[in-house]
Amino acid sequence: MEHNILVINPGSTSDDIGYYKGPKTVFEESARYSQEELDSFAGKELSEQIPLRRKFLLDVLKKHEINLNEIDAVIGRGGLLKHIEGGIYTINEAMLADLKRGYNGHHPSNLGGILAREIAESLGKPCFIADPVVVDEMEPLARYTGFKEIKRKSIFHALNQKRVAITAAKELGKKYKECNFIVMHGGGGVSVGAHKKGKVIDVSDGFEGAGPMTPQRSGVLPSLELVEMCFSGQYTIQELRKKMRGRGGMIAHTGTSDIADLYNYISSGKKKPGSTINCSREAAQEAFDAMIYQISKEIGAMATVLKGDVDAIILTGGLAYNEYLVNMIKERTGFITDKFFVYPGGDEKAALKEAAARALENPEIIKQYK
């Protein structure tokens, strides 16, 4: 059965909207907000952005002459809620309250659920979120660190990791809950997850940057040297956070997080106009190989979490477009399994659309947020 689904995916500087009739894309549009527009909300509650983003949404629907009464469901990007199990959740009063107050932080993704609920409620239609970044299915042993005061957290690319895992399971002729996968999502940050029978029982932190170094994240650092930097008086806490979560990894070593530009430079010696690469080709090659080495090592670590019982390794996100990276990871981790799936990119709107369709076709899978 085909369903008409409206997808709302707000980001820090943009909104992505999609409307679908079954497999057909009716439209997909993005709004990029100017710095001036965003600066007008500086220091204000996130909810004050709702009128701006609502106007874009309604204007787009009007532009494409969408009959609102034909919409079967609305789904928004999940925000910083309580840590929850993966799955599809109806946007109930408890969730709405936590999105509005920013239970786990304030980010424009919180507005996805708020706007979805608002539109759906006016139409008397169901509304959902699916697999937000706060999905937490980690087993107790995975939470431990060597400090009693510090626990490992589950923050990762849950929406895309779950989507590609479900896709890979179908290609194997199985259900997701019957499979064990290691999934690597690589973008500005990298998360590597151990998927055991439908749950991500351990995963590297793709937000704070624990795990391998990435195009923008530092990854795990030697503890003592980091402590010494913290107390050196040379950095504020904001500066160190930026070094770890925006200026680390490939940016720190090569001057860029643009992997396409970096690899072209490694291969041909040519940089794109305006390139920020600031190192030799040899240094760029070694840093790139070091990142691949660390990602591969994290995949190997997750194989031990699954006790070697791995149906496939899945590579996704923007990094999966780079054939050299994919081939080097396969070379290093092929002893774990000979089955690899590569799904470059990460289509959040498609993932949300598919989640809403599953919910409409199988209402029993819909979860309640508490």
Curated annotation (Swiss-Prot):
**Record's subcellular location:** Cytoplasm
Q: Which Gene3D superfamilies match?
A: 3.30.420.40
Key words, A-Z = ATP-binding, Cytoplasm, Kinase, Nucleotide-binding, Transferase
Q: Does the keyword Protease apply?
A: no
Q: What class of enzyme is it?
A: transferase
Keyword Metal-binding belongs to the record: no
Give the GO molecular function terms.
acetate kinase activity; ATP binding; butyrate kinase activity
Q: Name one GO biological process term.
A: acetate metabolic process
Q: EC number(s) in its UniProt entry?
A: 2.7.2.7
Which reactions fall under this protein's catalytic activity?
Answer: butanoate + ATP = butanoyl phosphate + ADP
InterPro entries attached to this UniProt entry: Aliphatic_acid_kin_short-chain (IPR000890), Aliphatic_acid_kinase_CS (IPR023865), ATPase_NBD (IPR043129), Butyrate_kin (IPR011245)
CDD domains, sorted = ASKHA_NBD_BK (cd24011)
GO terms for cellular component? cytoplasm
**SUPFAM superfamilies per the UniProt record, alphabetical:** Actin-like ATPase domain
Q: PANTHER family of this UniProt entry?
A: ACETATE KINASE (PTHR21060), BUTYRATE KINASE 2-RELATED (PTHR21060:SF3)
- Which family is this protein grouped under? Belongs to the acetokinase family.
Q: What is this protein called?
A: Probable butyrate kinase
Q: What is the lineage of its organism?
A: Bacteria, Pseudomonadati, Elusimicrobiota, Elusimicrobia, Elusimicrobiales
